[in-house]
Amino acid sequence: MGCAASKGDKSESHGRNEVSSWEPPNWDKEAGRLRDAIRGLGTDEISIVRVLARLTNRQRRKLLRVYKERFNEDLATVLETELRGAAKTVVDALLYTPEMYNVTSLKEAFESKDYDTVVSIIISSRNDSLMDMKEKYFAEFNKTLEDDLSKIPDKDVRHIVMSLLSVDRSSAKKRADKEAARIRATLLFNDGDILSLLCEKVGRNQLRETLAAFLELHRINIGQFIEEKCSTLSKKAQDTLKDCVLLIENPPQYFAKEMAKADELKILRMMVSRSEIDLYYIKKEFLSIYSRQLHDTIDKQCRFDYARLLIVILELRGQYSESAKKR
């Protein structure tokens, strides 16, 4: 096919997915709201999630510092003590940095042999995030991510994921070259090696332009093309390649389709991971594909203790102003 968690990490640098957002008028007031939700008559889980979800990841870290300064308590530790079950899982997800959340999710998926989730995390992550994840995975678990990826039972899928993980796009240009895209599209048509294209050291915009040129020049559905040219691969590997293409062409559509068949934990992971990127567009794609609202599906598809908290996140992070600034 070609192609050459520690809890302390909940307060480290957010990384590259920061989306500037609403600034609370009074940080002390936000810290006080959390304090009231925690110390009131019974822990108010909805209010805790509402305070955290209206903030970006970086703003949550500031709130952790303000809470410590005002009440002389470590908020993450307090929440760890006070929360149980779904609320603890959801709040943990909100407090992790994006890269550390992915690393933790990968480890949990490996332990439960949920290789579909492993593959989804790898193929949907930006190249710079993958590089960070590889470093953090080794630092956290004293083994390489590649070591655990070798456990993926489908050898074709394993090869695809390993190949994508080995690509360094740090020098890739952001602007697409249309003429180069047309030349590369013709080469793809002739050799049928979709994985080699996916593993080229070019940016996502160039890959998207190449796929668009492929359709324009050759009038062939890329999914059908993969089935024909990769017929010796397993069905799961073919589907993985199709997912890789969809993630280049239309990431929100990929996540909308994944959420439609996911349980509450997978929906949580995807919502939190995309909450500062394109959750707004995922909602729109979901409605377009399935003619129903995502929050209605969450309400029916997830256990109540998760659904009520996931809907809060969706309402707050799924607004245009919060998660529609990157396509």
What are the roles of these predicted feature ranges?
Residues 1-327:
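Long, charge-enriched amphipathic alpha-helical scaffolds and associated charged IDRs
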